[in-house]
């Protein structure tokens, strides 16, 4: 399956629009990661624990979106957008949403 942020796929023709498709992942951030990230921020550099959490959440949202597109009979997703949102009273949850248009291409 082709998944792209563009509104079309070069050399391919959209023959059917199946509809909007989304995937969502909500992930909690724990105390140890917060502490490690705080040390990283204090000493400078990148927080590998948070980066790993972001990558895992993004890949999960894309995977879920892809599975839903397959269920709709699509073989591609165009116009993909990925959004990140911090949730919870203490900002201790991360929501990643991937959305796009499920299509059939040839």
Swiss-Prot record:
InterPro entries per record: UPF0145_dom_sf, UPF0145_YbjQ-like
Gene3D superfamilies with a match to the protein in the record: Hypothetical protein apc22750. Chain B (3.30.110.70)
Family, similarity comment: Belongs to the UPF0145 family.
PANTHER family (alphabetical): UPF0145 PROTEIN YBJQ
Record's protein name: UPF0145 protein Cthe_0398
């Amino acid at each position: 399956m082709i998944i792209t942020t563009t509104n079309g796929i070069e050399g391919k023709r959209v023959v059917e629009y199946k509809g909007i498709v989304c995937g969502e992942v909500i992930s909690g951030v724990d105390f140890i990661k917060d502490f490690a990230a705080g040390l990283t921020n204090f000493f400078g550099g990148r927080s590998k624990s948070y980066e790993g959490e972001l990558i895992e959440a993004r890949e999960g949202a894309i995977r879920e979106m892809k599975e839903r597109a397959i269920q709709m009979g699509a073989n591609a997703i165009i116009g993909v957008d990925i959004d990140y949102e911090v949730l919870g009273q203490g900002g201790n949850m991360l929501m990643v949403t991937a959305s796009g248009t499920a299509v059939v291409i040839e």
